């Protein structure tokens, strides 16, 4: 299993038509974003004075992420992307 460092997040992209709260996203919005599930998170980032700031997402969250963000990786047969937390646009609450 992949364990990201810092503020990075491992995501599993959902390969289906994107909806948010039951609304289908317009075609142009789908081209700019992807829906994904958080698989793993890094420990967070440290502030200038050394305090650790935990990620705002957690394993299992569904998120909206920039379409071209991140790095494609494989772990066995599974495909994931690793993104910085700043590339996550929103948490999708069901």
UniProtKB/Swiss-Prot annotation:
Record's keyword terms, sorted: Chaperone, Cytoplasm
Q: State the superkingdom.
A: Bacteria
| Location(s), subcellular | Cytoplasm
Among Gene3D superfamilies, the record links this protein to: GroES chaperonin
What job does this protein perform? Together with the chaperonin GroEL, plays an essential role in assisting protein folding. The GroEL-GroES system forms a nano-cage that allows encapsulation of the non-native substrate proteins and provides a physical environment optimized to promote and accelerate protein folding. GroES binds to the apical surface of the GroEL ring, thereby capping the opening of the GroEL channel.
Family in the record: Belongs to the GroES chaperonin family.
Q: What is this protein called?
A: Co-chaperonin GroES
> From what organism does this protein derive?
Streptococcus pneumoniae serotype 19F (strain G54)
